[in-house]
């Protein structure tokens, strides 16, 4: 059903020139959910020779909010949410491989980028630039999406009866956007609670 209050803009998050143009022309935001995702089978580089997952889901996400902030398009007390993944629990952050990915393996790269998202959010929350904005990371659990099925068919087949549906996956995202409870910027959320981003 058409909604006159909704506007759709198609963006390639790895195309940083396109992101800059969007930020210059966009309206202001109270809520931003950073949820772009892809797991290419083979190494793909953007125009700046950065691996695609890193270029789109880490640098692209950051560049988008950075430019929106520079353009005065993020309102005071806005909430910015990075949708990470439980897959990041599989990986210790490897900064070198983010930018010099010589031996590309799609799942390891995905896990590393998702780990980097969570680490970056922790650091952003400490910066003066973001002091009037709430910045979070979260993971929605394993959700039965077409992207997951295409990228990890064996995992999808093995776990399909335990995967969450879209509504379940979106629950904490929506809650973080709308709750009136006190939220801690820089924290990592799962099922409406702050959890450790590390396995103990």
Regions found by a protein language model. Give the residues of each.
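Catalytic loop of short-chain dehydrogenase/reductase
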Residues: 37-45, 51, 76-132, 139-158
């Amino acid at each position: 059903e058409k909604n006159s209050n909704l506007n759709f803009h198609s963006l390639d998050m790895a195309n940083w020139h396109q992101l800059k143009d969007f930020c210059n022309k966009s309206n202001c935001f109270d809520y931003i959910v950073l949820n772009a995702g892809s797991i290419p089978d083979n190494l793909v580089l953007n125009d700046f020779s950065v691996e695609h997952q890193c270029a789109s889901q880490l640098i692209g996400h950051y560049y988008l909010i950075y430019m929106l902030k520079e353009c005065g398009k993020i309102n005071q007390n806005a909430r910015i949410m990075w949708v990470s993944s439980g897959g990041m629990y599989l990986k210790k952050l490897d900064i070198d491989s983010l930018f010099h990915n010589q031996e590309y393996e799609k799942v390891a790269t995905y896990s590393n980028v998702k780990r980097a998202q969570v680490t970056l959010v922790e650091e952003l929350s400490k910066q003066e630039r973001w002091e009037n904005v709430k910045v979070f990371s979260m993971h929605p659990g394993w959700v039965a999406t077409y992207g997951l099925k295409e990228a990890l068919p064996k995992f999808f087949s093995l776990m399909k009866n335990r995967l969450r549906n879209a509504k379940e996956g979106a629950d904490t995202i929506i809650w973080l956007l709308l709750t009136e409870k006190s939220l801690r910027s820089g924290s990592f959320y799962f099922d409406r609670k702050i959890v450790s981003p590390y396995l103990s």
